[in-house]
Amino acid sequence: HTRSSAASDVYKRQALGVLAGLLAGMFGIGGGLIIVPVLIGTFINLGFDESIIVHLAIGTAISCIIFTGLSSANAHRKKNSIDFDNFRPVAFGIIFGALAGAFFAVQIKGLFLKISIAIFIMIVGIQILFDLSFSSKRIHPNKNKSIFAGSVIGFLSAVLGIGGGTFSVPYFKSLGLSLTSSIGTSAACGVPIAIFGTFGYIIAGTNVMTLPEMSLGYIYLPA
C-alpha cells in the first residue's frame, strides 16, 4: 500500500510539472500559481511544522520554476519572440528583487502569505476574465525605469512563489510589445526570478531547525 501511495505521489507531481510547463509556455507564467497551493496541502498532510509550511511551499515552487522556465524560455527563443533589449534591464532588476523578496517572505507569517496568495489568484482571475488590455503604442523606457520595474516584478514573484508572468506580461504589453513578444520576454524573465529566488530561499533557511529532513533551506528536495 505504501509503495502504491508513493507511486501515486510521483504521478501527481509529474502531472503537476506538465501542467506548470504548459502554463509557462502558453501564458509566460511559471506555474507557481498551481504549484504553491498544492504543495501547501501536501506539506500539511505530511505533518510538517505549521510555522514553515507556506514558506517551504513557496521556496520549493520557485525552485521548480527553474526547469519549466528554462524550457519555456528556450522555446520562445527559437521562435524569436524574446525582446532582448527590454529583457536585459528588467532581468538585472529581477536579480535584486527576487533575492530581497525571498528574504522578506520568510519574515512574514504563513497565514498572511496565504491570504496574499489567495488575493493574488483572484486578481489573476479578474485579469484573465476581462482580458485587461494595455497600450499598443511602442514605448522605450529608460534603463533605470526598466531596472526598477524588474526589481518590483522579482520581489513580488519571489514572495508569491511564481514565475512573474502575471506582472511582466502586462508590463511588456504596456511598452507596446505584441502579445507574443510580451509572453516570450516574460517567459525569459521567469528564469532569473526562479534562480535568484531559489538562491534566496536556500540562504534564508540555512539555520532554520524546524525544516524537515531533505530540505535545502526552504527548498524541499523530494518535491
Task: Label each residue range with its predicted role.
Residues 12-21, 25-86, 93, 150, ...:
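Small-residue-rich hydrophobic segments that form or flank transmembrane alpha-helices
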Residues 94-99, 110-130, 219-223:
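Selective transmembrane alpha-helices of multi-pass membrane proteins
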Residues 19, 146-159:
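Hydrophobic alpha-helical transmembrane segments of multi-pass integral membrane proteins
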